[in-house]
Amino acid sequence: MVHRPRANLQELAKAVGVSKATLYRFCPTREALIERLLDEATVTVGRAIANCNLEQAPVDTAFKALIAGFLESKELTQFLIFHFRPEFLNESNPDRRWLDIQKTCDDFFLRCQQEGMLRIDISAVALNEIFFGIATSLVESESRGRVPRAGMAELIERMFLQGAGA
């Protein structure tokens, strides 16, 4: 769905190695499939963030875990890059999962500042956006063959910390 965004259900079924009937039973429309994948991506990202223990782990350990968790599900990351909608972060949205994820990460970057890992002249919110901007850009570039997968975690860490490090 990322590399062939206009693919029909038949083409999508073939790409994942199932029959169209099987895919149709799972999700009868393309829109239903997108919504189901968005839900799965949201759950996966939330679980990855929770597993990093951003609230209590030492900040350097949690930061490395955040990068690793982000890279573990790069296919879903690519899907989210393509299908993420601004309303996911709207305060009036009844589904608060993305707002909770965003707040957890904002709070983590604030903690990194308070503990001297990150500079304080850039807001924690901006650091969160910069971090995920770097990470998503590199994942997307890797999918196009421009950046190798090997060493990606170290590259993200180095590029972020050298610009934002205290």
Model-derived features with residue positions:
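Helix-turn-helix
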Residues: 2-32, 36
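Amphipathic alpha-helical interaction segments
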Residues: 11, 61-65, 69, 126-133, ...
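Generic hydrophobic, amphipathic alpha-helix propensity
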Residues: 12, 37-41, 45, 105
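Short amphipathic alpha-helical interaction/hinge segments
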Residues: 74-82, 139-143, 164
